[in-house]
Design a protein with these regions (language model features):
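Hydrophobic anchor at the beta1->P-loop junction of P-loop NTPases
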Residues: 4-6
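P-loop (Walker A) phosphate-binding loop of NTP-binding proteins
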Residues: 9
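ATP-dependent small-molecule kinase phosphotransfer cores
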Residues: 33-99
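Small-molecule kinase domains that catalyze NTP-dependent phosphoryl transfer to phosphate-bearing small molecules
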Residues: 89-90, 98, 117-118, 138-189
């Protein structure tokens, strides 16, 4: 099984690129949403470490945001609890797709949390800053302070780009992305 990890800036189109490969995708953001909506065990753990912020089940994203914005250490607490569960879900996904030729890992903190393996193929999604900003501002509940907190815990884009074997320039058109994906797949298969 070939594992392709998708890297890039927040809002660069990583999930869009991941879907367009046409292979099974593990999308960590989607899984986090499921955890917040359905996993009472994680809710109880978060409530225990952040009782003044987390009190609603299903977990309210505004409560998570308030906790992160209130204190830098709260983000680390949330990550330590949620990412363990994400790693477990990813391992289940990988076992389920063991016979697939390729799987795509759409995990924002792939390198930061050392989830990638040595022989993973890393694809960096590069987008213009102005396009990213325009896209982010359209997102429901976009919060610039929250965005900056997440940026601060990520490795630099330059480092991620250097670690990647391939770069996809995403100008947010199907054509450019799909042509790049075809070239990558031809090269690795």
């Amino acid at each position: 099984m070939i594992r392709i990890g998708i890297l890039g800036d927040i809002g660069s189109g990583k999930s869009y690129v991941a879907k367009n490969f046409g292979y099974p995708v593990f999308n960590a953001d989607v899984e986090v949403g499921k955890i917040y909506n359905k996993d009472r065990k994680i809710f109880n753990k978060l409530k225990k470490v952040l009782p003044e912020y987390i009190y609603t089940f299903p977990i309210n994203k505004n409560e998570i945001s308030d906790a992160i914005l209130a204190n830098n250490s709260n983000l680390r607490k949330i990550i330590s609890i949620v990412h363990l569960e994400i790693r477990t879900k990813m391992n289940i996904f990988l076992k389920k797709n063991i016979n697939k030729k390729i799987v795509i890992l759409d995990i924002p903190l792939l390198l930061e949390n050392k989830i990638n393996k040595k022989n993973d193929i890393l694809v960096f999604v590069q987008s213009k800053k102005k396009d990213i900003t325009k896209k982010l501002k359209k997102r429901k509940n976009f919060n610039i302070k929250l965005y900056k907190k997440f940026k601060n815990i990520q490795l630099s884009l330059g480092y991620k780009k250097k670690k990647s074997q391939f770069i996809i320039k995403n100008n947010f058109t199907n054509k450019s992305v799909n042509e790049s994906i075809k070239i990558i797949l031809k090269d690795i298969l």
